[in-house]
Regions:
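Non-transmembrane "mature" sequence context
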Residues: 1-148
Length: 148
């Protein structure tokens, strides 16, 4: 299974061919449209889901700055926020690859999992960088029919 920077870039709606250009895009600040795009795919019915990635006041300030076009840089995610969003997009791409469709991938991400001590994969991925390989490991095992 490959979870290339290309698949993640496509989910983010940016042009970055490979992991290094993707890293550069994250460091320079992903556009708010990337946040909206991934949130719309992962959790379309939860209007507050974006707040798991960007604080409410920060997001409101950035949207206002972007809308008024005073400062286009203010309408971008910080490197930390972009990293969190990219981590989510990467795991989401893998979940789609394993499950083959969005609803099954969404169920996996939002339901408690016994291999995560009853935590939801979405929470494990967003709460800490160390959670990403745990969830990717489960997805890898599922792909090869060896997960419980």
């Amino acid at each position: 299974m490959s979870n290339t920077g290309d698949a993640v870039s496509q989910l983010l709606g940016i042009r970055a061919s490979g992991p290094l250009p993707l890293m550069s895009a994250v460091e320079q600040g992903l556009p708010l449209a990337s946040l909206d795009r991934v949130v719309g795919l992962v959790s379309p019915s939860d209007r507050k889901f974006a707040l798991r990635i960007v604080a409410r006041a920060t997001l409101a300030r950035r949207r206002k700055a972007f809308a008024t076009a005073k400062n286009a840089a203010e309408g971008r995610l910080s490197a930390e926020e972009g990293t969190r969003l990219t981590r989510l997009a990467s795991v989401w791409a893998m979940a789609i690859e394993v499950w083959g469709e969005t609803e099954a991938a969404r169920r996996f991400m939002f339901e408690q999992h016994p291999m995560l001590d009853g935590r939801r994969p979405i929470d494990v991925v967003l709460d800490n960088e160390l959670g990403r390989p745990l969830v990717e490991g489960i997805l890898g095992r599922l792909q090869y029919c060896s997960a419980v």
